C-alpha cells in the first residue's frame, strides 16, 4: 500500500485510482476516486464490484457554476413552492454526517441507451470530465445539449471554498485533482462491506489498497496539503 501524498498525485495525473478515507468523526468511509476523464467501462466495473456504493462525479464549484448545475436541495426547495407535499423532504435538516449534502443533478449523456451499463456510465462520466476541463479553460459549453436528466450518474457540486468550507469526499477528491493539475471532476464510489452490510472499515480498505497497489490517503492529509497549496498560489499573486 502506498501512503505517500506525492504518489497519490502521480496516480491521479496518470488517471489511476486513489482510495480516499475521510475522517473517523465524519462518515468514516473510504471512496474509490478516479479522474473522470480517464473513466472507461473497466473503471466503472471496478467501482461497481469492488466499491459497491453510489457512483458519482464530484465537480469543482467554478465548473458547476459555469455549467449551471444547482444543488438538489435548492431545486427541491423551489419545486416545493408548487408541490407543497415535498416540502418536508426538501427541508430535511437531519443529515447525520454534515449540515447539507452536495448532490446536484442526476444525468445521462444523450448518446447512451439506458444509461446504467458500464459502457453507458463510462461515457457519461468521461464526457462530464471533458466538459469540466473545457469550461475551466474558458470555453462555453451547452450542458443540456449533451446531457439529459434524470439519469444514472449523480453529480456532486463541491462547496465554493472546497476543504475550507466542507470536508466531504466531494471536496477532498476535487481538491486532490486541483493539486494534481488535472480536470477537477472525479468519479467517486463508497467502498461497502457485503458481510457486515456497512461501510468497509478503514483497515479492510487499507488491505485492499495494499493488495492492488493503490495509493491510500486520508482527509486530514489532503486538507493540510491543500491549505499549503492555496497559500503558495495566493503568494504568487501578491
UniProtKB/Swiss-Prot annotation:
Gene3D superfamilies (alphabetical): DHBP synthase (3.90.870.10)
InterPro entries: DHBP_synth_RibB-like_a/b_dom, DHBP_synthase_RibB
Listed cofactors: Mg(2+); Mn(2+)
Keywords: Lyase, Magnesium, Manganese, Metal-binding, Riboflavin biosynthesis
UniProt record similarity statement: Belongs to the DHBP synthase family.
Purpose of the protein: Catalyzes the conversion of D-ribulose 5-phosphate to formate and 3,4-dihydroxy-2-butanone 4-phosphate.
Name the record gives this protein: 3,4-dihydroxy-2-butanone 4-phosphate synthase
The organism's taxonomic lineage, starting at the top: Archaea, Methanobacteriati, Methanobacteriota, Archaeoglobi, Archaeoglobales
Protein's gene: ribB
Amino acid at each position: 500500500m502506498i501512503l505517500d501524498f506525492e504518489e497519490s498525485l502521480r496516480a491521479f495525473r496518470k488517471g489511476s485510482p486513489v482510495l480516499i478515507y475521510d475522517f473517523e468523526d465524519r462518515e468514516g468511509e473510504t471512496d474509490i476516486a478516479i479522474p473522470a476523464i480517464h473513466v472507461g467501462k473497466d473503471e466503472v466495473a471496478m467501482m461497481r464490484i469492488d466499491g459497491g456504493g453510489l457512483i458519482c462525479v464530484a465537480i469543482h464549484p467554478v465548473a458547476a457554476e459555469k455549467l449551471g448545475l444547482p444543488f438538489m436541495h435548492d431545486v427541491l426547495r423551489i419545486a416545493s413552492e408548487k408541490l407543497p407535499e415535498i416540502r418536508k423532504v426538501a427541508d430535511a435538516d437531519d443529515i447525520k454526517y454534515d449540515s447539507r449534502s452536495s448532490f446536484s443533478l442526476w444525468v445521462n449523456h444523450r448518446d447512451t441507451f439506458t444509461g446504467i451499463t458500464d459502457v453507458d456510465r463510462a461515457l457519461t462520466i468521461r464526457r462530464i470530465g471533458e466538459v469540466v476541463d473545457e469550461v475551466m479553460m474558458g470555453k462555453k459549453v451547452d450542458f443540456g445539449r449533451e446531457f439529459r436528466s434524470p439519469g444514472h450518474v449523480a453529480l456532486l457540486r463541491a462547496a465554493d471554498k472546497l476543504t475550507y468550507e466542507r470536508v466531504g469526499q466531494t471536496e477532498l477528491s476535487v481538491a486532490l485533482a486541483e493539486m494534481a493539475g488535472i480536470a477537477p471532476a472525479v468519479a467517486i464510489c463508497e467502498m461497502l462491506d457485503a458481510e457486515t452490510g456497512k461501510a468497509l472499515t478503514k483497515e479492510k480498505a487499507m488491505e485492499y489498497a495494499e493488495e492492488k497497489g493503490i495509493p491510500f490517503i486520508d482527509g486530514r492529509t489532503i486538507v493540510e496539503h491543500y491549505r499549503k497549496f492555496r497559500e503558495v498560489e495566493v503568494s504568487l499573486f501578491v
